[in-house]
Amino acid sequence: RGCAVFAPQQETAAADTETLDREHAAAALEWAPTLLVDDGAHLIRLAHTEHQSVLSVNGGELRAASEETTSGVRPLEEMAALGALQLPVLAANDARTKRDFDNLIGTGQSCVFAIADLLDRDEAAAAGITAGVHGKRWVVLGYGPVGFGVARFASAFGARITVVERDAVRALAAMHDGHEAASLELALPDADVVVSATGVWHTLNAEALRLLRPSAVVAVAGGIDDEVGLDELLALGWEATGIAEHLDRWCPADSSRDEGFLLLAGGGGVNYTAAEGNPIEAMDLSFATQLVALDRLVGQELAPGLHRLRVADEDRVARAALAAFGGSADPRAESGRPGGAAQDWRVHRYRA
């Protein structure tokens, strides 16, 4: 049947992008797919709002989906909790073969490389930025897999890391990993580089952005729309001045032009907006995870709701990757006992 592609056939004006995206998303659903592989759950949510007729429960063809990202799984969890999710959706993002490689290693590496490259330009130097990562104070917001990866790679290049994390256990983990852990109010004023790795709307709102010193650099790792609250700054009269491609200075209207902070990639995910994206070795694992998710959706009827991949699904992807990379897993079988204990539970040190 060939492959239907819902995208412009030629270069388009930036002003037309949002309109075209909406039209193509609607066209993709009206094409009547039976399965979706989504990124951000935007198509899934569109099918549950403006295009409910495409859902199988309403007589349409769409009967299941798989979701790639943390930012997509979160709204799906809310939909499931409210009883609004009318499809079975597999959270490919939560599989170890996706989260522990694409999120942690791939995004961590690509974001740090992207930030370092963007700041190693003559325009950045003219704006008061010293190139390099070594010795700089990096503040990483969020210590999930992406934040952990960003902190690890930046630290490997010699950055001093402060982690801002609301979860006390994760904040403690950051300290045990050799970083500092502090509140937003304490961390931001001393930051050279601030990386938001939360995937949460308005993680850096206007109040937080006012804490930044002049020429502090702000970037988003991975990310969602409006993770940096630029809409709040515009409402307060702040202005953006372009310094170079993917580098803008944001200042209050009544300030001098060198007082504001520097924003990378317009507040979008810096690794895929202004750089090369994640390494293919990590992305291969994500795509393979999506493939086994589709295979399961084709072969098994699941109830509407959010589902996780099975350990066997993860193992299938991992073994294929090991073979491709020239490695292997230990072939010895586990005990087969529930819990995996090597001996019968009746065997203990105090037995008579």
Model-derived regions, located:
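ADP-ribose/adenylate-binding Rossmann-like module
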Residues: 35-39, 52-71, 200, 209-251, ...
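Glycine/serine-rich phosphate-binding loop and adjoining beta1-alpha1 elements at the start
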Residues: 2-134
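Short acidic low-complexity segments
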Residues: 178-191
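Adenosine-phosphate binding glycine-rich loop
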Residues: 88-127, 230-339, 344
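Hydrophobic Val/Ile/Leu positions in short beta-strands of Rossmann-like dinucleotide-binding domains
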Residues: 138-141
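NAD(P)-binding Rossmann-fold cofactor-contacting core
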Residues: 92, 155-177
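Hydrophobic/small residue at the entry helix of a nucleotide-binding pocket
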Residues: 146
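A short helix->loop->beta-strand "cap" motif at the edges of active sites that frequently abuts
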Residues: 3, 60, 85-87, 158-159, ...
